[in-house]
Amino acid sequence: MSAPCAIWSQVNAADQRHICIVTETYPPEVNGVAMTLAHLVAGLRTQGHAVSVVRPRRQSSDSRSDHCDPEVTLVRGLPIPGYEGVHVGLPAGRVLQGCWLQHRPDMVYVATEGPLGWSAVRTAQRLRIPVFSGFHTNFHSYSKHYRLGWLQPLIFSYLRRFHQRTTGTLVPSVDLRDRLQAVGLNNVSVLGRGVDCQLFTPARRCAALRHTWGVSDRDLAVLYVGRVAPEKNLGLAVAAYRAMQQGRGSFR
């Protein structure tokens, strides 16, 4: 991953930094944000940085965190209806302040914009800790897919206020950066998503698996990975596949 932005210059400015990531979703949950953060944490630790994570307690099997674990702190959360396994974090200003006074991070990265994230931004600012935010999900755009389009201006107004309070906002693509800047969001930088070339490599090509798909060595296998949901823009994926079929080659 690479990012020409303030947070990355601060991370690289010293031999080791303590970075605290505040998020409502994290492995073993399976979704894009959780996987992205897992790779970010692994990459930072590989570079010698200390990374701690604050996330909501998912279920009773999560061990209670009655003291400040320097790696993972569990806070109160509520399940999100219709989104199994994910909890929205409740405000946790006192818990965060206690943890950060005991193990003060050099910077805080707030990956999600819920009540937990809002309290993290306020607490970090009160303690004069640099705080950055991540814009991972277009929640304001999702509303129109669930007959709540009238809420879109209110949701985006909240998101804009949230991110404007932080030192900078990290987004996954240049396109999203440009769109956010066009609507008045400042200090937006790109934290690109890398590709694990050890995992995604032709060396892992499996003829037996392709045979079960009915795909020959000369054919191109087209795969969609993700939830089947309105906001995933599956129509575009289908249109892209149809366009590929009009070209040369065999696809499946």
Which ranges hold each PLM region?
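Nucleotide-sugar donor phosphate/pyrophosphate-binding loop at the beta->alpha transition
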Residues: 130-132, 141-161, 171
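A short, charged, and often flexible helix/loop element on the N-terminal side
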Residues: 70-99, 147, 151
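Conserved donor-binding/catalytic core segment of Leloir-type glycosyltransferases
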Residues: 215-232, 238-242
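Carbohydrate-associated surface elements
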Residues: 57, 175, 194
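N-terminal subdomain of nucleotide-sugar transferases
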Residues: 1-76
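A short helix/loop element that forms part of the nucleotide-sugar donor recognition site in Leloir-type
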Residues: 201-215
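A structural motif in glycosyltransferase catalytic domains
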Residues: 37, 44, 222, 237-238
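Short N-terminal targeting/anchoring amphipathic segment
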Residues: 96-117, 127-134
